[in-house]
Amino acid sequence: MKITDKEILLAVWQATVQRLPYVATHHYVGNLRGLAPSDEYWHQSATEICSVFREAALDLPLSKGQSLRRIKALIERNRLVVSGRRPRPGEGFHFKLPDNLTLPAFNLTQKLLRGYGMTEKDFLPDHGYAEIAQKVSTAVESEIGPLVEQYVRRCARQKEVTL
């Protein structure tokens, strides 16, 4: 089964959207959740995926080596972005979609969570948070998803690179 670049980019987007309500928050003692700050550090941290955990995050039917080669090829073609410095051979790294897609998703996630009463100082109980997280992910997908699909269509090559 051939996996296209489009499918990989959309898998990165889906992983980002599903994780955002959890990684844009802090988990506190007493099973409470509060918003993380809305600065650049937390935006990067919340929207990046570690190359070591790519298989679990992306859930693509690719081997370990093949998924790594394909992600690196997308980075080389500037379809994905490396967070932080460029990795040396054999090192793990963090990758993500460009900031023009992830920053609006991060900001919208925080705005929606504020709508549920969560702030940096007002916490929500962890019990029942999965339902809130799913609603937030769905809302982010419906609002920012069309921009991502447009980006993916622009990025998709007519001739896919097979490594």
Language-model features, listed with the residues they occupy:
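Short alpha-helical "packing" element that flanks the helix-turn-helix/winged-helix DNA-binding module
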Residues: E7-V12, N31
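Short intrinsically disordered terminal tails
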Residues: M1, R157-L163
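Short, Lys/Arg-rich nucleic-acid/phosphate-binding segment
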Residues: G84-F93
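Short amphipathic alpha-helical interaction segments
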Residues: P61-E76
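Short acidic, hydrophobic short linear motifs in intrinsically disordered regions
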Residues: P21-A57
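A short, conserved structural fragment
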Residues: I75-R85
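Short helix-coil-helix linker/hinge
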Residues: K2-K6, Q18-Y22
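Short, amphipathic alpha-helical interaction segments positioned at domain boundaries
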Residues: D99-E131, K135
